[in-house]
């Protein structure tokens, strides 16, 4: 009976041990390795054909190492004012997150955030271009 209980507890603990640790994207823009740019048309949050190759590269970089996670940073320039641009940046990030999850990347390995030219000098300088989502695959801890 005791052995069965221990086996059961071990099985229940397995998924908890496999979960990705919480992470944040503060400073992700400063990293230079495993950074991918996914383009969008002006005013759009729909993925186009040009997104296919960088999305494949993101999935390859994430691989099966559950310690690797991705910061998905949506950008929008001055496309309709501050509120509209931050909303568009968030929609773009969410679109990429949904597409990656749809291709099998667990959502707990993805974090999407919006970046706005009003709050980010890098976006204001158009590096990366303001009509992109930047995906930064973080190194495993």
Regions found by a protein language model. Give the residues of each.
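Periplasmic OmpA-like peptidoglycan-binding domain that tethers envelope proteins to the cell wall
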Residues: 75-141
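Sec-dependent signal peptide recognition
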Residues: 1-8
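Periplasmic peptidoglycan-binding/tethering modules of Gram-negative envelope proteins
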Residues: 17-68, 126, 139-141
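Short loop/turn segments at strand-loop or loop-helix junctions that form parts
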Residues: 40, 72-75
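N-terminal signal peptide c-region/cleavage motif recognized by signal peptidases
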Residues: 13-15
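Short beta-strand/loop motifs in extracellular/secreted proteins, especially
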Residues: 68-70, 108
